[in-house]
Amino acid sequence: MTASLTTKFLDNTYENPFMNASGVHCMTTPELDELANSKAGAFITKSATTLEREGNPKPRYISVPLGSINSMGLPNEGVDYYLSHVLNRQKKYPDAPAIFFSVAGMSIDENLGLLKKIQESEFNGITELNLSCPNVPGKPQVAYDFDLTKETLEKVFAFFNKPLGIKLPPYFDFAHFDIMAKILNEFPLAYVNSINSVGNGLFIDVEKESVVVKPKNGFGGIGGEYVKPTALANVRAFYTRLRPEIKIIGTGGIKSGKDAFEHLLCGASMLQIGTELQKEGVQIFERIERELKDIMEAKGYTSIDEFRGKLNSL
């Protein structure tokens, strides 16, 4: 019995549910091409701002024993760079499944401007609006402000009619899950992506008695194994609260087929990999695909739909 990882997401069919997390291995055209030619089912661009951004001073990304700490500050080549890349790729491979395009403006107005540019372009893929970057000094995460989130989405959907998902930060309280889900259910969202890194963690070099990243006095977003339980909880919480039309992309702590299986069991439709992709490179997709298939075949599953979202309670 052979397990299939074929994944239907919106109107697209992907060979498997795996993709990069925006921010990892997607800064430049060569990196994006490498993703496209890898075993990943899909890929997403670097979160784009209107103009090129250098980001925060280095060191700003450090691998630590169970994951990573980063305070990148949204370095990117600017929206026109990535839009040109995806439009060229659409023309070259018209039958390929949809590309994901990420934007992360520094303000509501910038986000609206970015989305208007995408709306007016020939881009026919899926857009992700990042409302949860924790690493830009002086810029709070929009998605922790429920009123501002609702205001943003009202303005976005007044004109934007292409498929749109949003990337959320982690939440830690049932009341916050309830409030955010109620807001999101009011809008024609394609998906939510849970989670972005756990913001404002601190990692210390004991020998130097120092922090390990330079920006924000060492405070940075935490990724990797550290965040998997939080990521799973957020995936599950939104899967059980959102309208079934709003899909879930699970992100956080995926480094093995077992981790992927857990995210899918909680209700995720697609899976993004960040920290472990940074450590291992694009060959990770082939390994995790094989490991997930092995788990499914051992359990007698032939497709992901047979177990997605079917997490048992005690």
Swiss-Prot record:
Organism superkingdom: Eukaryota
EC category name: oxidoreductase
GO molecular function terms noted in the UniProt entry: dihydroorotate dehydrogenase (fumarate) activity
Residues at the catalytic site: 132-133
Catalysed reactions, as listed in the record: (S)-dihydroorotate + fumarate = orotate + succinate
Binding site residues for substrate: 46, 70-74, 130, 196-197
Annotated PANTHER family: DIHYDROOROTATE DEHYDROGENASE (FUMARATE), DIHYDROOROTATE DEHYDROGENASE (QUINONE), MITOCHONDRIAL-RELATED
Protein name as catalogued: Dihydroorotate dehydrogenase (fumarate)
Organism in which the protein naturally occurs: Saccharomyces bayanus (Yeast)
